[in-house]
Design a protein with these regions (language model features):
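Active-site and adjacent substrate-binding regions of carbohydrate-active enzymes
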Residues: 1-139
Length: 139
């Protein structure tokens, strides 16, 4: 099952899950089908009878060009670019519980911070990046 399909092909839930992944310690790794928010490939599964092929769609160049125009994929690319360039992720992580199902993950150095505020029941989140130059809202 693809990660996107496991979340009901729900763009908001998928981006929230990927945002949490990007804010947890370590280097986030995303399989190519996940990078394109790919759905289960039931046709490939049926034709191959190989269970793991459900999440191994073989994209043509045309399909890739179409998929990268989807808002959920563009947002994921933007999130990953932020994760790869923000110096805050070189700092320390602080977890703050707000309420049941709501929390903030904040990475900070002396120069900058990046905060992910999450509300799991609504699939909503926001990211605030603070730099020496000022505040910048990412999502």
């Amino acid at each position: 099952c693809t990660y996107y399909s496991a979340l009901g092909n729900n763009d908001a839930a998928y981006l929230l899950a990927r945002a949490i992944q990007c804010f947890t310690p370590g280097i986030p790794q995303i399989y190519y089908v996940g990078l394109l928010a790919g759905e289960n490939d039931l046709e490939l599964l049926e034709n191959s009878k190989e269970g793991r092929n459900i999440n191994r769609h073989y994209y043509s160049l045309d399909e890739i060009n179409q998929e990268i125009e989807r808002p959920v994929v563009k947002d994921l690319f933007r999130l990953l670019a932020f994760r790869n360039t923000a110096k805050a992720f070189d700092g320390d992580l602080k977890i703050t519980m707000i309420d049941e199902g709501a929390f903030t993950l904040t990475w900070a150095t002396a120069e900058e911070s990046a905060s992910l505020t999450v509300d799991l029941p609504t699939n909503k989140f926001s990211i605030l990046h603070r730099t020496a130059a000022g505040d910048e809202q990412i999502f």
